[in-house]
Amino acid sequence: MMSNPIADHSQKIYQEQCNILREMAEKSNCVIVGRCADYILKDMNPFRIFVYAEMEGKMERCRQKEQSHHNTMTDRELKQHIKDVDKHRAQYYGFYTDQKWGDRKNYDLCVNTTNADIKNVAAILTKLFE
């Protein structure tokens, strides 16, 4: 059976990512966004937070970023782009963890940011751990 060089390379990248995340978590308290960190660090008992938003909240946030980058997508294009990004995140998470991305049982806290300012949410969450 032949090995797949792309799959082999992806697996090596994932392994290195695991090593880096573990090393960071062992050195000090840290916040890691994504990268299957909840799963990779599960033996270290991390506080796992899943931040999500409804589609209209995601679109609004993207529109705000879009203005500063001078990009423009139609609502339909933007919605499809967001769905594609979420689909790839779910596939990545599922592939490496055998768990469902966004499933509340995998997290200690789930935060809906649809009607919230992300910076305010981050500040509030930071205060939880001071």
Where are these regions (language model features)?
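ATP-dependent small-molecule kinase phosphotransfer cores
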Residues: M1-N29
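Short, amphipathic alpha-helical "lid/cap" segments that border enzyme active or binding sites
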Residues: C18, I118-T126
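RNA pseudouridine synthases
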Residues: M24-K27, A37-M44, I49
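Divalent-cation
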Residues: G34
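Conserved nucleotide-binding/hydrolysis micro-motifs of P-loop NTPases
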Residues: A37-D38, A53-K58, A116-D117
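Conserved phosphate-donor/acceptor-positioning beta-strand/loop module used by diverse small-molecule
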Residues: D43-Q64, M73-D84
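Small-molecule kinase domains that catalyze NTP-dependent phosphoryl transfer to phosphate-bearing small molecules
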Residues: N71-I118
